Amino acid sequence: MSSVNWNTLLDIDNHRIPHLIIKHKERIGSLSTNLGKVFEANIQQSAKDQGLFFYRIKDVNPMAIKRNFGVSKNNYDCFLYAKGVLFPLELKSTKSKSISFSESMIKAQQIKHLEAASKYEGVLPGFLFNFREPENRVFFIHIKDFLTYKNIAEKQLAHTYISKVNKSSIPIGICEEIGTEVRWMKKKVNYTYYINKMCEELIQGGDAKHRQG
């Protein structure tokens, strides 16, 4: 019986293991992306079911950007229109307890264009942050409140927040303080989000301070 060449096997494994790790990370990233898309689809369907105008901006093909085809990146994910107010929205979903400020999660141009939209009367731009674990929760965070927090967090400035301030992310606790929580009802698989109630809260009082520019 021929002997086993352990050096050869180890060499094969040393080449395979990094490849398997990369593949595993790709699968995890793909799953996270898919769950983010499910969240976006649930928001869109909820708005439609509640008779709200909702326009989802089509994603730009990443390969087109990579190959420099002259296409521009989206300013944000979608527009929502309710009761005479326009809501430019960027949707983010995570299984973590905080949303990272990193470029891979929140892109600079998204912040830039949401901030630019806030200068117009009758426009309430912001993020919809979905925290999937330990229980599903969603918050609307006005871009101005987000930027105020981000500046304080990154520069470690004095503040009046009750919750812990993370230097490189915005946690659930801060969202509870500065945001408007979106209520939901779970179906068999998907969620119905009460977008109409969120809009009413923001328009009637919750974000009245921001409508003056």
Predicted regions and their residues:
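Intrinsically disordered, low-complexity terminal regions enriched in charged/polar residues
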Residues: 139-213
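Acidic-basic catalytic patches of nuclease active cores, encompassing PD-(D/E)XK
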Residues: 1-69, 205-208, 212
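Short, solvent-exposed loop/turn segments at secondary-structure junctions
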Residues: 62-64, 96-99, 135
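Conserved catalytic cores of phosphodiester-cleaving nucleases, focusing on short active-site segments
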Residues: 78-80, 84-96
